[in-house]
Amino acid sequence: MAVTRMLAELTVPLGGQRIELQEIDYGTGGMPLLRIRIREGRRFTVFEIDAQSARKWAEEMLAWSRKSQ
């Protein structure tokens, strides 16, 4: 059985999308995953990604954020 731990929740100011970041541990000796859950009205988009992919995504978002300020 998977164990889920909430890491962060935020609302995007433009558009009002709700974003949740959760750590998922499936408990079968596998690696933990990061679940990114985006709610837009009644629609959900869900990604489950590994630590390496999360790091690359975070680095790209941070680089863009720094350029755009």
Each predicted region: which residue ranges?
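Positively charged, low-complexity terminal tracts
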Residues: 1-69
